[in-house]
Amino acid sequence: MRSVSATGKTRMMGLVLALWLSAYGGGHAQGLAPFQKLAGQWSGSGTIELSNGTQEPIRCRAAYDVLEQQSNLQLNIRCASESYSFDLRASATYAAGAITGTWSEATRNAAGTISGKADGDRFQVVATGPAFTASLTLVTRGNRQSVTIQSQDEKTRVKGASIALQRGS
């Protein structure tokens, strides 16, 4: 049986996954492959909201590798707040307007799936795992992304997050 701490950390993996999904750029509206502009290093910060109503600052760094005619993506992302830190790996594919993929976090033996659709510079995405489901709203303008995450699970330790990412130079 999972402890509350382990469950909270697994849910945080969903928040990290949201950061990754947030970098899917504005290329959809222009008919370009969504991963086209992702290759490279990204970083950002924001806040997470805990179930007790408190907020913590969070910082993240991500590395993106775009593969196979820019329709596949490999990701490694590291994030840390006062009470969380983790190293997430993920893979995604873009086909016929849909983004699908998988993620894993080996230190906590956690894994799950992602799915979503793009509408211009706005994305509505769902991340799932055995211990959580999270709704994600993503907006991209140029080299900046804003991410709003809301857990769909009432018992989660992390209720949501608001994060901004920017591509490194």
PLM feature segments, named:
Residues R2-G14:
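Bacterial N-terminal signal peptides that target proteins for export
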Residues Y24-A29:
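Sec/Tat signal peptide C-region and signal peptidase I cleavage site
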Residues M13-A23:
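Bacterial N-terminal signal peptides
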Residues G31-V139, Q150-S169:
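Central antiparallel beta-sheet cores of small beta-barrel/beta-sandwich binding domains
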Residues Q145-T148:
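Preference for long, well-ordered alpha-helical segments
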